[in-house]
A protein has these predicted regions:
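N-terminal [4Fe-4S]-dependent radical SAM core
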Residues: 1-73, 79
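Auxiliary Fe-S-binding modules of radical SAM enzymes
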Residues: 1-18, 22, 39-42, 162, ...
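General N-terminal targeting signals
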Residues: 26, 31, 47, 89-91, ...
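Intrinsically disordered, low-complexity sequence elements enriched in Ser/Thr/Gly/Pro
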Residues: 27, 36, 107-109, 140, ...
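Short, surface-exposed, charged/polar-biased interaction segments
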Residues: 41, 48-51, 95, 118, ...
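Conserved AdoMet/S-adenosylmethionine-binding subsite of the radical SAM
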Residues: 55-209
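Short, intrinsically disordered C-terminal tails of secreted or membrane-associated proteins
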Residues: 257-258
Length: 260
C-alpha cells in the first residue's frame, strides 16, 4: 500500500493481491508487470512470487488504519475479479471498504463478467466507485456489464486507448478517464479518438478526465488537450453522514507508507 500515488486520478493505492494474467489487447504491455519485475529485484516481499497471482491477507485491513480520508485505487497491481481469486476474498475486500467508509475506493476490472456474477452478493456502499477498463470497440461489452451493477458511482478507464470508440452509451456512467499507453513498447493513440470521446462526454454531461498522451516519455508528451488540462471529476455521491460516522467508529493511526 502506498500513501502517495503517481496516478493522476487517485491519491493512494492498496494491493491486497498482486499479479495477473493477460486477457485482452490492453494487457499486452502491462505496466504492473514491468513494475513487479523491478519491485521483485528490489527484494519487496510482496513480490517474491513475481507476477504470479498472490493474495496478501495481511494487507486487507490496512485501510482501517488510515485515519485521514483518502481516495484509494484498489489493486493497481492486479485485478480483484481475476478467475483465480476466491469469491470469499473478493467479498471480504468489499466488506473492508464498506467498513472504512471515511475513504473513497476506486476499483477497475477487465473481468466484467465475474463482476456481474457477484454483483448481488457484493456489499456495495456509496464510498465504492466501480469501473471497467475498455481499450477498444471489442471491449465495450464491459460497459454494459458495469451499468447493470448496483455500484453507486460507475466509471470508465479508456486506457490504453487503442482505437476509436464512437457512439459510446454513457447512460448510467458517472465518469470517463482517457489515457494513452506509456512505456518502451507503447502503441500510439490518435488525438482524434480522444477529442471524439470528450465531445461524447460533454454531450452526455459526463465528467471527462484526460490522464496522459503516453508514449515512451509520458512526462514529455504531457496531458494537455486543446490547450487545457481536463481534470473533471464526478460529483461525490457518498452520504457525508455515513463517512463521518465511519471516521468516528474507525480504529487505527495516522496514515503512513506501507509499500506497494
Amino acid at each position: 500500500m502506498s500513501l502517495s500515488s503517481s496516478i493522476e486520478w487517485t491519491e493512494s493505492t492498496w494491493n491486497p493481491l498482486t499479479g495477473c494474467t493477460k486477457i485482452s489487447e490492453g494487457c499486452e504491455n502491462c505496466y504492473a508487470e514491468r513494475l513487479t519485475r523491478r519491485l521483485q529485484a528490489m527484494g519487496n516481499p510482496n513480490y517474491a512470487n513475481g507476477f504470479k497471482l498472490t493474495l496478501h491477507r495481511h494487507v486487507l485491513e490496512y485501510p482501517l488504519r488510515w485515519r485521514k480520508p483518502q481516495t484509494i485505487f484498489v489493486n493497481s497491481m492486479s485485478d480483484l475479479f481475476h478467475k483465480d481469486v476466491p469469491d470469499e476474498f473478493i467479498l471480504d475486500t468489499f466488506k473492508i471498504m464498506k467498513q472504512a467508509g471515511w475513504h473513497r475506493f476506486q476499483i477497475l476490472t477487465k473481468r466484467s463478467e465475474r463482476l456481474l456474477k457477484l454483483n448481488k452478493v457484493i456489499s456495495w456502499s456509496p464510498n465504492i466507485w466501480m469501473g471497467v477498463s475498455v481499450e477498444n470497440q471489442d471491449c465495450t461489452f464491459r460497459i454494459d456489464h458495469l451499468r447493470t451493477t448496483n455500484a453507486v458511482t460507475k466509471f470508465l478507464s479508456l486506457e490504453p486507448l487503442l482505437g476509436p470508440l464512437p457512439n459510446l452509451d454513457l447512460s448510467g456512467i458517472d465518469w470517463v478517464i482517457v489515457g494513452g499507453e506509456s512505456g518502451p513498447k507503447s502503441r500510439p493513440m490518435n488525438p482524434s479518438w480522444v477529442v471524439d470521446i470528450r465531445k461524447q462526454c460533454q454531450a452526455a454531461t459526463v465528467p471527462f478526465f484526460f490522464k496522459q498522451w503516453g508514449g515512451q516519455n509520458k512526462k514529455k508528451t504531457g496531458r494537455i488537450l486543446d490547450g487545457e488540462i481536463w481534470d473533471e471529476m464526478p460529483i461525490a455521491k457518498e452520504i457525508q453522514g455515513f463517512r463521518k460516522r465511519s471516521l468516528v467508529a474507525g480504529v487505527g493511526f495516522e496514515p503512513t507508507t506501507f509499500g506497494l
